[in-house]
Amino acid sequence: MDKKTVVIINTNTMTLDMLNSLCAQMLPDVRLVNIVDDSLLPEARENGITPAILSKMSMYVQCAEKSNADIIINQCSSVGEAVDILRKMITVPYMKIDEPMAEKAVEIGGNIAVIGTVSSTLEPSCRLIEKTAEKLGKEVKVKPVLLDGVVDLLSTQEGKKKHDEIVCNEVYKQAEDNDVVVLAQASMHRIKEKLKITKVPVLSSPETAFEAVKKILG
């Protein structure tokens, strides 16, 4: 039997190894293909979703469709809102990596803390949760928590330790007053294994996305 193909459109190489490894664990019978364009994130951080971003991403999703992808995942939440436009152009399912996480957070409900280390990701992540709650008829209170600039620590080995320490401490803090803690960026999944027991669920987008892909592909 031919393997199902999952295509991930990435805006950086930072999460490639983690996503490849997690996919191999959770979806061992799937063929994973990565498309990487590291010009997308700087543009989105500076100017939001621009025509240039839409043009490039349109090309990538159409290439993925022509390559017989069974599902396409958008890895970066900073350009996630482009998916709402581009998914109308193709017939293949096109998922924002944080959509399943948003649904799970809303199902848990109540007070939702969303921790991010990039403002261009945090804002659309919060909007996605609010829109998901509206669609599902749920009332939630979303609290954005920006750890500004912390993502830049991931560029060095010593910085990675500091990044993980800062994010973990913030998770513990937000777990005191909220019903669920959401990690806004795929790059933050790395801290899950470092967390000690928390009072509430802590959700990461790669894990919930691959769980959703498994259900979709059957």
PLM features: what roles do these ranges have?
Residues 1-218:
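Non-catalytic structural scaffold of enzyme domains
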